[in-house]
Design a protein with these regions (language model features):
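Catalytic-core segment of enzymes that process non-peptidic bonds
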Residues: 57-117
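Flexible loop/turn segments at secondary-structure boundaries
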Residues: 12-13, 45-47, 89-91
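N-terminal phosphate-binding loop and adjacent alpha-helix
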Residues: 9-23, 60
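Active-site beta-strand/loop signature of hydrolases that rely on acidic residues for catalysis
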Residues: 18, 29-52, 82
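Generic beta-strand/beta-sheet core signal
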Residues: 6, 39-40, 84, 104
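Active-site-proximal beta-strand elements of phosphoester/diester hydrolases
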Residues: 1-14, 100, 112-115
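Short loop/turn motifs at secondary-structure junctions
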Residues: 2, 30-33, 77, 97
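Hydrophobic pocket-lining residues that define ligand/cofactor binding sites across diverse proteins
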Residues: 26-29, 73
């Protein structure tokens, strides 16, 4: 298995730019026969998002970007992508969002792992 580690510098709130960086790096990795490309924490939305996490539109935009990246993985032979993002929280602890790593392959989210301290 070939794994590529992508050291990109995402910009907070630049979903289009961050998605483009992710897909450009993944495309280069595909040409090298890579099976999995791993991106940094919060690569989709940028780090640190600070109070932007309180805005529902910010979290929704992150979800749309994840969907776009997942669709890219649908074509046969493309590498899986592991990247960090934010997602709505379904918890009773009062938090609206969660910091997660998502594994994207075959055009969908295959697995997600929430960050815990």
């Amino acid at each position: 298995m070939k794994i590529a580690l992508a050291q990109i510098n995402p910009t907070v709130g630049d979903f289009a730019g961050n998605t483009r960086k992710i897909l450009e790096f993944a495309s280069r990795a595909e040409k090298l026969g890579v099976d999995l490309v791993a991106f940094p924490e919060l690569a989709v939305c940028g780090y640190p998002p600070a109070d932007l996490l309180e805005k529902d539109a910010f979290v929704a935009h992150a979800g749309r970007s994840v969907d776009e990246i997942a669709r890219w993985t649908a074509d046969a032979g493309r590498p899986a992508i592991l990247c960090g993002t934010v997602m709505p929280a379904a918890s009773s602890n009062g938090k609206k969002v969660r910091n997660v790593a998502v594994l994207l392959s075959g055009g969908k989210v295959c697995f997600e792992q929430q960050k815990t301290l």
